[in-house]
């Protein structure tokens, strides 16, 4: 299957640069791939798509202020590090700029030396493994020195960093937000729960690979990035009970889908408590094992996320829905509007 099969025209002005004032006031395109229907709505009406006894599954990861600006103590050259994932202890995989100046043994200081990084390994594409040294608690030091790592297609400064977090963000570790969840308010979640829908949380720490375009023509040659996930026993039991009672598992976003389908694939369709690393690539031809419906934002052309949605709803219908969204001036990407896929 060719990457170009998932391309579409997207006017640049439809790429949302800032969040709307109210999280749940974004537009919602409701599509049903069996009936081949599309309905224009608003996000706070997502409650009408959920039935008593369903489970709404959300990713409770929290975005780290993962962009650090520092300098080399020997040359005073400026350095930017973007934290990708914690590999062990105080060691992190990072994206470094300018990478060519950062060889094994190089040091970088941040915040007058309150945080120091030593390069201990060189990876491809500007990647490095660094070991941090600091006084106190790492996350507190990071909160004081780091900046929120907004996606490369957002050029406006974010006034309130919490708008790039979901209202239920809890587990620190992501380099990017699980953006399908940004539309939910605490009030909307209370109403959904009052309707008899089970609110279930899992964790997948989103890496920067989520923004990387597919660089090969043949999808079979694409290497997916790896991300850490976790599902608790309590959450797994709730999902098993929902399935057994005939309810649906409704995922919020592609990160929740990838976690649930990783677990479903590992346990032959059963839902078990689990944690580990996943590089699952869901593309047309994939048979879904756990997820019955989902919400998601509008994604980049030729991205693995468009391929995932196409695997569920069919490529032609998804691209038709995207053309409709462009015609109706839906807002795209992280701060954009959403779709609900039945």
UniProtKB/Swiss-Prot annotation:
The keyword Flavoprotein does not apply. Coiled coil: none annotated. SUPFAM superfamilies: QueA-like (SSF111337). GO terms for molecular function: S-adenosylmethionine:tRNA ribosyltransferase-isomerase activity. It is found in: Cytoplasm. Its EC number is 2.4.99.17. Keywords: Cytoplasm, Queuosine biosynthesis, S-adenosyl-L-methionine, Transferase. Pathway: tRNA modification; tRNA-queuosine biosynthesis. One of its GO terms (biological process) is tRNA wobble guanine modification. InterPro entries: QueA, QueA_dom1, QueA_dom2, QueA_sf. One of its GO terms (cellular component) is cytoplasm. Gene3D superfamilies: QueA-like. NCBIfam families: PRK00147.1 (NF001140), queA (TIGR00113). Belongs to the QueA family. Transfers and isomerizes the ribose moiety from AdoMet to the 7-aminomethyl group of 7-deazaguanine (preQ1-tRNA) to give epoxyqueuosine (oQ-tRNA). This is S-adenosylmethionine:tRNA ribosyltransferase-isomerase. It comes from Streptococcus pyogenes serotype M1.
């Amino acid at each position: 299957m060719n990457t170009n099969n998932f391309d579409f025209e997207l006017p640049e002005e439809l790429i949302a640069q800032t969040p709307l004032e109210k999280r749940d006031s974004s537009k919602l395109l409701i599509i049903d791939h069996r009936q081949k229907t599309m309905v224009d709505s608003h996000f706070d009406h997502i409650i009408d798509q959920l039935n008593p006894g369903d489970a709404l599954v959300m990713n409770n990861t929290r975005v780290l202020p993962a962009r650090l600006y520092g300098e080399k103590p020997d040359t005073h050259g400026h350095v930017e590090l973007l934290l990708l994932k914690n590999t062990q202890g105080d060691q992190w995989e990072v994206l470094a700029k300018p990478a060519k100046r950062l060889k094994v043994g190089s040091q970088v200081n941040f915040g007058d030396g309150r945080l120091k990084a030593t390069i201990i390994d060189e990876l491809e594409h500007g990647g490095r493994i660094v070991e941090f040294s600091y006084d106190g608690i790492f996350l507190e030091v990071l909160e004081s020195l780091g900046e929120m790592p907004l996606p490369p297609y957002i050029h406006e400064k974010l006034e309130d960093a919490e708008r790039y977090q979901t209202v239920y963000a809890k587990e620190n570790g992501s380099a990017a937000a699980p953006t399908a969840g940004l539309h939910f308010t605490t009030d909307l979640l209370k109403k959904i729960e009052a309707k008899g829908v089970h609110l279930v949380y899992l964790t997948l720490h989103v890496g920067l690979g989520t923004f990387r375009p597919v660089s090969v023509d043949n999808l079979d040659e694409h290497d997916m990035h790896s991300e850490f996930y976790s599902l608790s026993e309590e959450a797994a039991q709730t999902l098993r009970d929902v399935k057994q009672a005939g309810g649906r598992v409704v995922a919020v976003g592609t990160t929740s889908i990838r976690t649930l389908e990783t677990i479903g694939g590992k346990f032959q369709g059963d839902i078990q408590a689990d944690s580990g690393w996943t590089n699952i690539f869901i593309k047309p031809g994939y048979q879904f094992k756990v997820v019955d419906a989902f919400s998601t934002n509008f994604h980049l052309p030729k991205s693995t996320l468009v391929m995932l949605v196409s695997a569920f709803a069919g490529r032609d219908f998804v691209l038709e829905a995207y053309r409709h969204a462009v015609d109706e001036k839906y807002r795209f990407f992280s701060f954009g509007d959403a779709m609900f896929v039945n």
